[in-house]
Amino acid sequence: YKIDTIIDFAYSTKKTSTYQNYLTARDEVVSKGTKHYTAKECYNEENGASRTYNLTDDISLEILWNNYYFDNTTDNENNYSVITRFKYKEQYFLFTGDLEKEGETKFVEHYKGNFPSVELYKAAHHGSKTSSNDDFLNLINPRISVVSCSAGNNEYTDYYKNTFPTQDYINRIAKYTDQVYATSLYSEESEKPLNGNVVVSSNGDDVAVACTNNTTKLKDSEWFNSTVY
């Protein structure tokens, strides 16, 4: 497929081979005509970039404000995440990458009192304990939340309450919605689907959720009830 435009973070200090591979692949397609902008350029509408991209007559993609497009002092790379919001008619769908509490706090200060409720919130940082904080969730008031994670994976911690999606995320999101879905389930043999691929669709009035494995809400899943509680 042909890539028309790439939008990525405005700053990074990453030296990993994965990041270097991304830069190589990005620069190769840019050399063939793909447009490349940073989130900072988009938000400031510089160098040909736009803050809002109209994908169809009814669908737009907006690059939202993030303090760390401009302030490179955070010691957590996750806060450099590109924050995007899709709009379909009068409905909103929010993606915040791996944004952490520090970035969320700045976001709330910037948009406080002027942010519409969202139909979908793709949980930041895989449903970590350091994202999806109370003030942030109160601002966006999500109807549905989807977690892209390997539920119960102990790669980063052996304490089950801190594996993704974490107990802190679950407790906080539960104040706003029980429509929470997670993609995968950790297994020592191989990854297994929890909900599987999660597709959120809208006709402009109603929003529906379809999954390749099942549409069981996280709170009703066997994993949640046998492992978390």
Give, region by region, the residue ranges found by the protein language model:
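Loop/turn elements at helix/coil->beta-strand transitions in domains of secreted/extracellular proteins
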Residues: 1-5, 30-35, 59, 88-92, ...
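Solvent-exposed, acidic/flexible segments
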Residues: 15, 19, 77, 93-97, ...
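Cap/insert and terminal regions of metallo-dependent hydrolase folds
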Residues: 5-8, 13-14, 104-195
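Short, conserved catalytic or adaptor-binding loops enriched in Gly and charged residues
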Residues: 25-31, 52-55, 111-114, 171-174
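Active-site HxH/HxHxD metal-binding segment of metal-dependent hydrolases
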Residues: 1-41, 142
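A generic structural signal for solvent-exposed, polar alpha-helical segments
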Residues: 25-28, 43, 132, 175, ...
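Core dinuclear metal-dependent hydrolase active-site scaffold
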Residues: 38-116, 120, 191-229
